[in-house]
Amino acid sequence: MAKRDYYQVLGVAKNASDDEIKKAYRKLAMKHHPDRNPGNKDAEEHFKEAKEAYEMLSDSQKRAAYDQYGHAGVDPNMAGAGAQGFGGFADAFGDIFGDIFGQAAAGGRGGRSGPQVYRGADLRYSMEITLEQAAHGYDTQIRVPSWVSCEICHGSGAKPGTKPETCPTCNGSGAVRMSQGFFSIQQTCPKCHGTGTYIPEPCTHCHGAGKTKETKTLEVKIPAGIDDGMRIRSAGNGEPGINGGPSGDLYVEIHIKAHAVFERDGDDLHCQMPIPFTKAALGGEIEVPTLAGRATFTVPEGTQSGKTFRLRGKGIKGLRSSIAGDLYVHVQVETPVKLTDAQRDLLQQFEKSLVEGGARHSPQSKSWFDRVKSFFD
């Protein structure tokens, strides 16, 4: 099945800003999140589709590649794409893709002999946290796959008792020259991939890679106020460099789980608050939840369903904010159910008193009936 256009998935224009893309993704994620739609396969697919679209369009490099080449520009099976989930940009045998990914440590060889030095690939790790953890900060540990020097060949990639030999194609320079008419182009040696050597008898344990994978534990400090989609950089914990090049970095991408009570909008929080119709009619103090505990505020007499109250400073203090956002409480007036006969009689007496009183006890209803009457007159 062909993939839909990422902009179409999020419902934004191709020139949409980063904020517009983020807001569109947050809205779809809230709507289709599996926690809110248990057992709903369609919602799960929509959630995955929106997540994939956001991951591509929120990254400036991936977005540029997608804008120019479409899905082919970000297909993980083609030479321009990053990894899905957790993974590097080079495979287990240390294939080098050079400047396509910006991994050359010095921007090329500059005409010098000897093997090229490459920076290790960056890795990505996706982590889900709760809204409370995002608001207050969170220290945790993660276990990630990591490359280490092969214990059998000690990193040489060669079978014990043998050693790498000088590449016969480039004579150890790591590069070859290709002539095309009047032009001479230097490019990475196709046999040794720029290392200047080749391995006639690869190590059977690491298959000539000189490294093997193991799992290591890393400490991750999630700062208070982090938002969905933000990344935390762990320097030097990506894949090891090639030929002595520096290691890449590990990027921990944060995703915030849907909350049972609150919805986040930047530094602000929103919640739906049901109140009994008697409290709405008479007014009084109500108790509402916040991320810091419980808070109280007074609803005025005659509060209507849908009324929004703002509690200043009861939201989240963002990473770049000096003060916390606000909590918006959206009141929903509840109608009582399963009435007893005595309660029903009381309500009927109450309704009768409203009609006989002649006062405008229901201003919205009165206004609506007036408009309907004028429509038919």
Curated annotation (Swiss-Prot):
J domain ranges (all copies): 5-70
Gene encoding the protein: dnaJ
UniProt-recorded name of the protein: Chaperone protein DnaJ
Record note on cofactor: Binds 2 Zn(2+) ions per monomer.
Stored Gene3D superfamilies: DnaJ domain (1.10.287.110), Heat shock protein DnaJ, cysteine-rich domain (2.10.230.10), Urease metallochaperone UreE, N-terminal domain (2.60.260.20)
Native organism: Paraburkholderia phymatum (strain DSM 17167 / CIP 108236 / LMG 21445 / STM815) (Burkholderia phymatum)
BP terms from Gene Ontology: chaperone cofactor-dependent protein refolding; DNA replication; protein refolding; response to heat
Cofactor: Zn(2+)
Subunit structure, as described in the record: Homodimer.
Ranges annotated as CR-type zinc finger: 137-215
CXXCXGXG motif repeats: 150-157, 167-174, 189-196, 203-210
Domain-related comment: The J domain is necessary and sufficient to stimulate DnaK ATPase activity. Zinc center 1 plays an important role in the autonomous, DnaK-independent chaperone activity of DnaJ. Zinc center 2 is essential for interaction with DnaK and for DnaJ activity.
Keyword Chaperone: yes
Cellular compartment(s): Cytoplasm
Function per UniProt: Participates actively in the response to hyperosmotic and heat shock by preventing the aggregation of stress-denatured proteins and by disaggregating proteins, also in an autonomous, DnaK-independent fashion. Unfolded proteins bind initially to DnaJ; upon interaction with the DnaJ-bound protein, DnaK hydrolyzes its bound ATP, resulting in the formation of a stable complex. GrpE releases ADP from DnaK; ATP binding to DnaK triggers the release of the substrate protein, thus completing the reaction cycle.
InterPro entries the UniProt entry points to: DnaJ, DnaJ_C, DnaJ_domain, DnaJ_domain_CS, HSP40/DnaJ_pept-bd, HSP_DnaJ_Cys-rich_dom, HSP_DnaJ_Cys-rich_dom_sf, J_dom_sf
Family note: Belongs to the DnaJ family.
Gene Ontology molecular function terms on file: ATP binding; heat shock protein binding; unfolded protein binding; zinc ion binding
Entry keyword set: Chaperone, Cytoplasm, DNA replication, Metal-binding, Repeat, Stress response, Zinc, Zinc-finger
Pfam families (alphabetical): DnaJ, DnaJ_C, DnaJ_CXXCXGXG
Key word Metal-binding present: yes
Superkingdom of origin organism: Bacteria
Residues at which Zn(2+) 2 binds: 167, 170, 189, 192
Gene Ontology CC terms: cytoplasm
Coiled-coil zones: none
Major localization listed first in the record, in broad terms: cytoplasm
UniProt-annotated binding residues for Zn(2+) 1: 150, 153, 203, 206
